[in-house]
Amino acid sequence: METHLYSDLAFEARFADDEQLPLHLVLDQEVLSNEEAETLRYVYYRNVDSAGRSAGRVPSGDEDDAPASDDAEDAVGGDRAFDRERRTWQRACFRVLPRPLELLDYLRQSGLTVTLEKEQRVRMFYAVFTTLGLRCPDNRLSGAQTLHLRLVWPDGSYRDWEFLARDLLREEMEANKRDRQHQLATTTNHRRRGGLRNNLDNGSDRRLPEAAVASLETAVSTPFFEIPNGAGTSSANGGGRFSNLEQRVARLLRGDEEFIYHAGPLEPPSKIRGHELVQLRLDVNPDLMYATDPHDRDEVARTDEWKGAGVSRLREVWDVQHRVRLRVLWYVNSFWRSRELSYDDHEVELYRALDAYRARIAVEYVLIRAVRDEIYAVLRRDSGALPQRFACHVPRNMSWRVVWELCRHALALWMDRADVRSCIIKALTPRLSRGAAAAAQRARRQRERSAPKPQELLFGPRNESGPPAERTWYADVVRCVRTQVDLGVEVRAARCPRTGLWIVRDRRGRLRRWLSQPEVCVLYVTPDLDFYWVLPGGFAVSSRVTLHGLAQRALRDRFQNFEAVLARGMHVEAGRQEPETPRVSGRRLPFDDL
């Protein structure tokens, strides 16, 4: 609750410069595991319009004067497009509550008033409270824009989800519109009553219609134990009854003494039965001056107003692909309700937004399909003759017909289950993040290592003894019998000095025995984007992941994990370095870690 209140105040303070509507979200075990929730480091978000462009405020002075060429923008790691894309991300504050709770009970225990139309118990093993922003330029909200949420962990890994503004806002905007209409009708009724009171106070001689008299007689009835004068003669004189009622209504609205109840004089709040309880501060220190006039009304703290108004609605929202479900809390006193925001929900813009989203997420499937096609192309080119590249003992009487059938089914299963967690994406992400300068530096270091050294020219290459160097690879393990695919497994690979075959171990140094299992196929991808499709026995199809012909800008937008996200204290939207305030979490964050 405190995180949502703080974020709401922060959004209100910068609304004039950065118009955003705050969305107060709650993430639970359906989104993150317990370990992921406790080790969460950053929460970022950005808005993308219906055309697929990032809708963000770029700081003054940081814009590029000259447009970049198509070749420069299409190069992997293009720095200018990388910087422009980076500025659209904004950091959100969050709080981790690492204990079981019931959401509505937790809100009530925090002092909030919960007034839901239909209450439902929401049990959580742990919760992450955060607030994201939706762009509303010129007080206009579009249901076709997309909100991108990115969670980042200290090791550099991250997860992305996309949400349509239509799913987030439609029900709340309709409910808020009904509330405003009800409030407007109530204000209009009060204004009409005030006009009627003024007419009666001015002594208007106009007679009220009979329907108005009947409604006034129902609303303002006579006292229970009082018989009005002329009640017995009202039947004889019909006009006297209406005249008497008009007079009583006029006297009631005018505030005559006989209609006012007096409870007696009130004592000062500092006295009980005439005894002084606390000495006035002015008597203690005559030079003390009050900040406000004694007759000014007391100002209610914003926290008290927030808690008193409480929560009006609790909504469940799915992402575009229906993978995760978040909960949105709508507070009554959120500042945006007084801004009179307009909401547009055009079907044409929604279709454009969905087309842009499909084109964006299609990049990963294009990569996966390209790897599959390359595997089939290598098999056709080599006529099915595969060399053994990984160390594994194979029996002489092994049935290769079963192996080829397994290869076909394993490829189909991998195509069906692979997504952004695949080893291809994990190997590609660092290359997109390093940039053109880092790629040139890496190539220069490689040339220096490959160049012959002077001592090698004189004495020949040295024979260095020791264990072979290990390399970090990523693997997708396809288990055909269980129809299970383990995506993005990090492994260590080294060549056997005796046979020259690859030996694969896990991060703890334990030997991986996938190749000796007859129902398992493995796809390995190196950081240089070389891949091995390995069949049982260590026989592999080797080739390279080609990026030619792919939309490089879409690749960067989809998969790059820029260093600015992981830099400590970096304001991504402004690009300036400042000390970082510690996040609020269930455990204290030591300042030494900042």
Curated annotation (Swiss-Prot):
<keyword id="KW-1188">Viral release from host cell</keyword>
<keyword id="KW-0231">Viral genome packaging</keyword>
<dbReference type="GO" id="GO:0051276">
    <property type="term" value="P:chromosome organization"/>
</dbReference>
<feature type="region of interest" description="Disordered">
    <location>
        <begin position="176"/>
        <end position="205"/>
    </location>
</feature>
<keyword id="KW-0426">Late protein</keyword>
<dbReference type="GO" id="GO:0019033">
    <property type="term" value="C:viral tegument"/>
</dbReference>
<keyword id="KW-1048">Host nucleus</keyword>
<dbReference type="Pfam" id="PF04559">
    <property type="entry name" value="Herpes_UL17"/>
</dbReference>
<dbReference type="InterPro" id="IPR007640">
    <property type="entry name" value="UL17-like"/>
</dbReference>
<protein>
    <recommendedName>
        <fullName>Capsid vertex component 1</fullName>
    </recommendedName>
</protein>
<comment type="subunit">
    <text>Interacts (via C-terminus) with capsid vertex component 2/CVC2.</text>
</comment>
<comment type="similarity">
    <text>Belongs to the herpesviridae CVC1 protein family.</text>
</comment>
<feature type="region of interest" description="Disordered">
    <location>
        <begin position="443"/>
        <end position="467"/>
    </location>
</feature>
<comment type="function">
    <text>Capsid vertex-specific component that plays a role during viral DNA encapsidation, assuring correct genome cleavage and presumably stabilizing capsids that contain full-length viral genomes.</text>
</comment>
<keyword id="KW-0167">Capsid protein</keyword>
<feature type="compositionally biased region" description="Acidic residues">
    <location>
        <begin position="61"/>
        <end position="76"/>
    </location>
</feature>
<dbReference type="GO" id="GO:0019028">
    <property type="term" value="C:viral capsid"/>
</dbReference>
<feature type="region of interest" description="Disordered">
    <location>
        <begin position="575"/>
        <end position="594"/>
    </location>
</feature>
<keyword id="KW-0946">Virion</keyword>
<feature type="region of interest" description="Disordered">
    <location>
        <begin position="52"/>
        <end position="77"/>
    </location>
</feature>
<dbReference type="GO" id="GO:0042025">
    <property type="term" value="C:host cell nucleus"/>
</dbReference>
